[in-house]
Amino acid sequence: MAKLYVVGIGPGGREHMTFKAVDVIKSCDGIVGYTPYIKYLEGLVEGKEVFSTGMKGEIERCKKAIEMVKEGKNTAIISTGDAGLYGMAGPILELAGDIDVEIVPGVTSAFSAASELGAPIMRDSASISLSDLLTPWEVIEDSLEKAAEADFVIAIYNPKSKGRKDNLEKALEIISRYRKGTTPVGIVQDSGRANTKMEITTLDSVDCDTVNMLCVLIIGNSNTYIIGNKIITPRGYNIL
């Protein structure tokens, strides 16, 4: 029987894909994904059956991938970053029934952004999406409150969109109840891609007007500091 692979392709760009992800995509007969993400597979999908949709087509893509497997085609459904974090792994497993599914991990945007900023995620951390399309805002607020109170480094995904202009401001206000205004914040747009933009600032100086849905924010904990053009969250090693 054919197999369904749920593949995390990293933040974007062939150089950030794992060898496993590349091998799986090359071996599959069918590829399913969000239309803008298919372009990251240039050189890997020629001659294959490719199915893509736009925004809000996640379940349609999952059902199509399962259908292709049932037709006897080894199929890969792709997610940027890691498919198990805000990706396709969950809905595929919920829908797959008895078909053979393998999850192929990828580099998630928070860790890609962290590598560009320095070493801001060296200790306990929390990843929180500000998108309230699938999660009620009250739940997101509660997550922000608890992560900030616990002094986790916080990686914020989906900080802003045309329909969610105020969520980032609300999130920063919640975090500011537990963090000093001088807490380092890294903002990375298009992490891991050719047009990456990066800014290192502080919690009380974040310009929300410059942040968009392509950004990841990493907000330090009480020990995080800036040295030169890097952010560091020390783990506790005796360096001296």
Feature names for model-found ranges:
Residues K73-I78, I121-D132, D204-M213:
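A polyampholytic, Gly/Pro-enriched intrinsically disordered region
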Residues I9-P11, G33-P36, T53-M55, T80-D82, ...:
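Fold-independent oxyanion-binding glycine-rich loops
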Residues G10-H16, L134-W137, E199-T201:
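Short gly/ser/thr-rich secondary-structure transition/capping motifs
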Residues I38-Y40, E58-I59, T108-S112, L133-P136, ...:
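Short gly/pro/ser/thr-enriched loop/turn and capping motifs at secondary-structure boundaries
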Residues V6, T75, E149-L240:
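A contiguous loop/helix-start segment that scaffolds small-molecule binding in enzyme catalytic cores
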